[in-house]
């Protein structure tokens, strides 16, 4: 009798976990009933024509950063595209990368890159 109850409880537990997962994915991916509140507006075109127009209209006699269209003296002086969530790390060879800010301390992302370059990470 106890083994029957254990099987029933196990089946109920599995069913509830499966239902919770399906609800998560349904909510995560829209579940087929997405609401659109865009009154008459459309998404931007998926080609690069708008970017090309901005590129061609930008005046710069130095280096034009491809991601931000900032005019700078050297490529490694280009600002990050999303400075609120990215840290810029200069690699020392005249190049730089923008990486997601990580952790809780300022400069932690740069520290991790330096450790990786030294083979310690």
Curated annotation (Swiss-Prot):
Signal peptide range in chain numbering: 1-20
Highest rank taxon of the organism: Eukaryota
Gene Ontology BP, a term: ERAD pathway
Disulfide bonds: none
InterPro entries on file: LCL2
Keyword line: Signal
Transmembrane segments: none
Keyword Transit peptide in record: no
Function: Probable component of the endoplasmic reticulum-associated degradation (ERAD) pathway.
UniProt similarity note: Belongs to the LCL2 family.
Protein name: Long chronological lifespan protein 2
UniProt source species: Aspergillus clavatus (strain ATCC 1007 / CBS 513.65 / DSM 816 / NCTC 3887 / NRRL 1 / QM 1276 / 107)
Gene: lcl2
């Amino acid at each position: 009798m106890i083994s029957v109850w254990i099987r029933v409880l196990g089946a109920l537990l599995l069913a509830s976990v499966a239902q919770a997962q399906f609800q998560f994915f349904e909510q995560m991916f829209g579940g087929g009933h997405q609401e659109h509140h865009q009154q008459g507006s459309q998404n931007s075109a998926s080609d690069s024509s708008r970017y090309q127009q901005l590129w061609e209209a930008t005046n710069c006699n130095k280096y034009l950063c491809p991601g931000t269209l900032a005019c700078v003296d050297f490529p490694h002086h280009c600002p990050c595209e999303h400075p609120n969530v990215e840290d810029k790390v200069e690699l020392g060879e005249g190049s730089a990368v923008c990486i997601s800010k990580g952790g809780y301390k300022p400069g932690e992302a740069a520290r991790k890159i330096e450790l990786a370059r030294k083979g310690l990470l």
